[in-house]
Design a protein with these regions (language model features):
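H-loop (His-switch) and adjacent beta-strand-loop-beta switch element
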Residues: 197-201
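A short, flexible loop at the N-terminus of ABC-type nucleotide-binding domains that lies
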Residues: 1-19, 24-26, 67
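ABC-family P-loop ATPase nucleotide-binding domains
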Residues: 72, 78-135, 142
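Conserved ABC transporter NBD signature motif
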Residues: 54-65, 69-70
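Helix-to-loop junction immediately C-terminal to a conserved catalytic motif
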Residues: 46
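Helical segment within the ABC ATPase nucleotide-binding domain
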Residues: 161-176
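Catalytic Walker B motif of ABC-type/P-loop ATPase nucleotide-binding domains
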Residues: 147-151, 156
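Walker A (P-loop) phosphate-binding loop of ABC-type ATPase nucleotide-binding domains
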Residues: 33-37
Length: 201
């Protein structure tokens, strides 16, 4: 599913070196303190930044920006990204329906009810927990084979964290070939969810 061989990325005051393999059907966690390189590792896998050295392979695609067909197979939730604060959940629904041929409209609607995400309220009025739940919901609503989630539970209370972790458990249980890569600086979140955990430091 994902392999990283002798991958290195260096910034002015930071250097990351990684070699790992994430097999199909596993939940893999990256744990480490803030600034350790978890988000950089995610961006390298997604082709958002280029490595200085080494080889990265995702779905058999080696290096560079991922092709559109591969992107359709991936659901992503990044901490610093999201939809415009002026959008409503209904707006997000329409965008996802256009972006993904396999977008599950009924599933999205049902989970909005379960997670108490109001459809007509602007996202700027959402709490931190509501925004986090929406980010994860958008990632899992188009039958992705691979989920990549960067700090999906950061800054959330216990109830919101548990709702997100339950969503992920339900998602992986629906298809044993589905794969999740999740990062967190809270090791207890990952210990209860993941098959494999890498310490990034």
């Amino acid at each position: 599913m994902i392999t990283m061989q002798n991958v290195r990325k260096k910034y002015k005051d930071f250097e990351l070196e990684l070699s790992l393999e994430i097999p199909e059907g596993r939940i893999t966690g990256f744990v480490g303190k803030n600034g350790a390189g978890k988000s950089t590792a995610i961006k390298l896998i997604l082709g958002l930044v280029k490595p200085d050295a080494g080889k990265i392979c995702v779905f058999g695609n080696e290096g560079g920006e991922l092709p559109a067909a591969v992107k359709q197979k991936i659901g992503v939730s990044l901490t610093e990204s999201g939809f415009s604060s002026q959008f409503t959940v209904e707006d997000v629904w329409h965008i996802l329906a256009k972006m993904y041929p396999d977008f599950q409209k009924d599933f999205f609607d049902q989970k909005c009810d379960v997670l108490k995400l109001p459809r007509k309220k602007k996202l700027k009025e959402f709490s931190t927990g509501m925004k986090a739940k929406l980010r994860v919901l958008t990632a899992i609503s188009h039958k992705a084979d691979l989920l990549i989630l960067d700090e999906p539970t950061a800054g959330l209370d216990v109830e919101a964290r548990n709702e997100i972790l339950d969503l992920l458990r339900e998602y992986i249980a629906q298809d044993e070939k589905r794969t999740i890569l999740i990062t967190s600086h809270i090791s207890t979140d990952l210990e209860s969810l993941c098959d494999d955990i890498y310490l990034i430091h």
